[in-house]
Amino acid sequence: MRGLISRIFGFVAAIKFPRFLQTFINEKYVSGFKIDMSEFKEPKEYESLTALFTRELQRPRDFDVSPQAFISPSDGTCLERGVSKELKAISVKGHEYGIAELLGDSIDRSERGAELEYVNIYLSPRDYHRYHAPCDMRILSALYVPGE
């Protein structure tokens, strides 16, 4: 049921309503979820809920540059962090998954018996939904894991 609701929301959120109606929808979404828009354009500037949901920062954020700092790639709430030994299960959105089930063949065979650290970050509808890296880097591969 959760997947169906997400698909319906995604479909409706992509619709570009007439400006007066879109402004009303955006403002209700922002106030309903108590979104802090101080780092973003005004709600009326977004042509759809999808555009608002995936809004860009007006300027780059500052972050802690100390070597001991953990910089999260996204806004959100850290639900869980830990070490998974021998690919034991972790919880994501209320379901238990083995790391191999989540990441499949992307795990190097040499890591399969190793202790792997993980962080589970929940992005609520009010959170900023873009990801950033606090360093110069090049992505060598990406893996899409569809939800239910």
Language-model features, listed with the residues they occupy:
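Non-catalytic terminal segments and appended small domains
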Residues: 1-148
